[in-house]
């Protein structure tokens, strides 16, 4: 799209013809012709198709910016904002625990968090100290980090699935002075107790008898019952740019990293979600996501903390209870992530799926292949798909329901929100540079790395990084938009269409090249999963000795050994190109997922198609016979020797 050139040419022609003495109507008509001929018509088309969307997005951006500016000038923090909300509506339900039925009003959440703040100050903790929080998602989880924040103490929110070395690593890198763990996590803490050091204070919360408490652990609940519940006489000198808590990355590509969440980032994420999807003051939000991640704790719980919505928590997603919970608690907004929507679709059809009041589903990772099936099947009018990591400064949101899109950036107002797709070497993920040393922007339709220009003075564009300086530096590139600037590297490849809609491409390693073609793992996964009734599927490329590229391999959940590979292959041939059909199959009891329901492929890729690495059933596609054959050590050796044509 050559809008600057088109505009310049049309204005120049208008002036020239006017100087030659032609009537202005003729001059204008000629100038318009030059404009259209120079590519301007495409620009007008884009304006007509996207103006409404872009203006709404601009209004959201301005609204969030003004709210943040007001809170910064007032010296607010997230706890202060919450206290104002609690004072306005003390008796409204703030948090509901769907697992236990326990309900907390805003006054109760405020009182509990006040007790936490007073207790830890009495124990000698000072603003800036770190306390690790390790318990399942329930109201106490929110009250603990909120209370610590009231005292200026930074909470390190630990993934409840961590065990042994990763758990000890996360505790060590956080520099925590204390650990608060739930009774349900006692066994996990016991496994690493010798690695934690005697200086680490331990507090246990929840239903756990004194005889079951680990040595050197104090019972937190009785201590909180004795602590003052009045607001702190003097709040710590904290502001919107100070640290609120740490959230750990999922660790799918290595050990988890502690991402720094400052008060303004918490506000920004929650506010963008609230305004982008027009949430209402009387909404009830269903949050079954982990609270140790930003989707559940900021996008979800943030609606309670900042805007006063009621949030219904369930500590662990349950496909069979999802819609029952929504009906029971009159939920109007639900959250999803990863494969949750697919899990819901594969449940038996029940009447309750249509008796709910849910109008909006907010999240990320909804596959385009099941997008409309989900909205039509469950009667959910709006999907609020968004893209953004906890620490990133280039989040985007799909505000108008464009199927398959994870968000947009305006093609008209490109500089209002300075993010960009840049060309990269997809093997190394290093940005490519032009002759001036700047990154090369992608054209519509070209896949590129999403980057966001950094401005530490702007709460919408700052990048706070990680506790580890080296990890932070790896995510920053310089001279990206212009000489001397800096930008955040998302690590994710997206594609933008002509209208500015962006579509998520797989992370590096999730596409592979086979028979001269690029194979999208998500596309193959979606096809296989649909053929098999929304079964869990992981698709990845594996190297075969002496063969160029990588062969496709599919790991399929088959807990009851019911899958017939060759019946599946007959259907697969109808819907997948030959180069995309998996050469290898691995049938296993279940496919590993992360705590946020993303497929884990690291171990599967490492073990490949070697039967010595697994007891799972393996199959190999013999192209001559046109069928999958069992793959044992003898067949494996023949494949590696090149006896089969792949």
Curated annotation (Swiss-Prot):
Keywords: Cell membrane, Cytoplasm, Fatty acid metabolism, Ligase, Lipid metabolism, Lipid transport, Membrane, Nucleotide-binding, Transmembrane, Transmembrane helix, Transport. Expressed in muscle. The chain crosses the membrane at residues 14-34. Inhibited by Triacsin C. Residues 191-475 are annotated as: Sufficient for oligomerization. One of its GO terms (biological process) is lipid transport across blood-brain barrier. PROSITE patterns: AMP_BINDING. Its main location: membrane. It is an enzyme of class 6 (ligase). The keyword RNA-binding does not apply. One of its GO terms (molecular function) is nucleotide binding. Residues 1-13 are extracellular. Self-associates. May function as a homodimer. Interacts with EPRS1; mediates the translocation of SLC27A1 from the cytoplasm to the plasma membrane thereby increasing the uptake of long-chain fatty acids. Interacts with DGAT2 and this interaction is enhanced in the presence of ZFYVE1. NCBIfam families: PRK08279.1. This is Long-chain fatty acid transport protein 1. It comes from Rattus norvegicus.
